[in-house]
């Protein structure tokens, strides 16, 4: 039902890129060269239906073509000069959407097939497989592919970027706090261990 609302196209990403190269009289050898990889490795990547968003972002940048806009049904924002493209903190965006929907990790698992034990790891990721991101988008009724781009000189997009940056800052502060707590726990355990060793030594017990 959600996929009908969003209407995110089910795309073979490799074929989409190959078709683009052909229509613009460019070869796979050219793409391999600008990506600084050998042609054999590129061929393997392009044979696959899906691709990591980080890789698709790189290819979009190198070819000056917004492939994410195809997933977003914004074909008017595919060509150079019509859009701004950014690499969002996808995990943060997904987590924020879950909070907005008040969706539990159990519900997220039911809708996406991602195990609850993996959810926290997923929410810290920056790059996602395009097929997986499509599933997550459908489950949360939000097209996350649109977070990669905006219309050029769109003031609303600038505001969203600022909010995203603030979210990243808050996440970093949260992780720093967790790190400090973990370090303190380790120090406490070391002190406790030293205390126990001292007591055992005083009692004449070898260890």
Which role fits each region the language model picked out?
Residues 12, 53, 57, 79-80, ...:
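Helical coiled-coil/dimerization "stalks"
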Residues 48-61, 125-138:
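Short, basic-rich loop-to-helix N-cap that marks the start of a DNA-contacting helix
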Residues 104, 161-185, 190-192, 197-199, ...:
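Heptad-repeat coiled-coil/leucine-zipper oligomerization helices
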Residues 24-41, 100-120:
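Short alpha-helical DNA-recognition segment
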Residues 1-24, 76-101:
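A short, Lys/Arg-rich alpha-helix, primarily the initiator
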Residues 64-81, 141-158:
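Short C-terminal boundary/hinge segments that cap the last helix of small helical domains
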